[in-house]
Design a protein with these regions (language model features):
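A conserved short beta-strand
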Residues: 185-195
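Short beta-strand/loop motif that positions the catalytic acidic residue
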Residues: 211-213
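Acidic catalytic loop of the alpha/beta-hydrolase fold
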Residues: 216-221
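Bacterial N-terminal signal peptides
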Residues: 10-21
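C-terminal catalytic histidine-bearing segment of alpha/beta-hydrolase fold enzymes
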Residues: 232, 237-281
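Serine-hydrolase catalytic machinery in alpha/beta-hydrolase-like enzymes
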Residues: 31, 36-42, 52-155, 252-254
Length: 281
């Protein structure tokens, strides 16, 4: 009887271990906060953050850039976070912090650096509408040049591995996809509810692309099928997920659309981390 009783803790330990091992990535990954909780998440983060200025060669631009570091013993791959049409906000910084929590060096540049009033960036504009207009005035070649400077900075970090990816949202999602057509050394691109490049641009794409979309976002989703067809013809990887009932910007606006945005976020973020780890680690 005594021997049988002693087996119980061991059996329970085995059962617990099996339970932990069989948990899906979705059960173990923490999603970023919504826009509402972004500031608090940043204030309470235990990870190392810093602001740096990244010089862009052959220009007078110095990109004001937020960097979040993971807590890990070995070197980490780099993920460039490409802002929404609203510029470099607390929410984009909170996403970078969450990526660091998932093991990546996350770099979020303000692509409006030097283009705001008084030579400032996102924070210098008087209204969000002014920011939106300024972001929409940025040309794809300009953005590629800026992201190339950011990728070089990331590669120069002593704590970084050579592999890097982009994760973009809204306008930044489209830029993330386009950058994959312009930067052959990019290892992966994640597109959150961003439109797809032209058929002609897709011909030069190299890295795998993950696209995450809300079902109720026709302006964006209408561009998925043509891109998917072309990518298949080219033999390139383009994985897409369209989340039922979710709208544009679902990861930022998790509280909207009667839970559909939150459910989409709970599925999309683990898919993002799994994709990044597969292609960067």
């Amino acid at each position: 009887m005594v021997k049988k009783c002693r087996l119980v803790p061991s059996i329970l330990a085995v059962i617990f271990t099996l339970f932990v091992v069989t948990l899906s990535l979705a059960d173990r990954v923490v999603i970023p906060p919504s826009e509402i909780g972004a500031k608090a998440a940043l204030d309470n983060s235990v990870r190392h953050h810093e602001w740096v200025k990244i010089e862009v060669p052959a220009t007078d631009v110095q990109l004001n850039t937020f960097v979040a570091y993971p807590e890990r013993k070995d070197k980490a791959p780099v993920v460039i976070v490409v802002q929404e049409v609203y510029g470099l906000t607390d929410w984009i910084r909170a996403v970078a912090d969450r990526l660091a929590g998932d093991g990546f060096i996350a770099i979020a540049p303000d692509l409006l650096s030097g283009r705001g009033p008084g030579g400032g960036g996102t924070e210098a504009f008087a209204t969000r509408d002014d920011v939106v207009k300024a972001v929409r005035d940025l040309s794809p070649p300009y953005v590629v040049n800026m992201l190339n400077a950011v990728s070089r900075y990331g590669a120069s970090l002593s704590a970084a591995t050579p592999k890097f990816a982009t994760v973009g949202f809204c306008w930044g999602g489209a830029q993330s996809f386009y950058y994959a057509t312009a930067q052959p050394n990019l290892n992966a691109a994640v597109v959150y509810y961003g439109t797809s490049p032209t058929q002609e641009a897709l011909v030069t794409i190299r890295p795998p692309v993950l696209g995450l979309y809300g079902e109720d976002d026709a302006r964006v989703t209408i561009t998925i099928a043509p891109a998917a067809k072309k990518m298949k013809e080219l033999g390139k990887t383009y994985i897409t997920h369209i989340y039922k009932g979710a709208g544009h910007g679902f990861l930022r606006a998790q509280q909207e659309r009667d839970g559909a945005n939150l459910e989409a976020s709970r599925q999309a973020w683990p898919a993002t981390i799994e994709f990044l780890r597969k292609n960067l680690e």
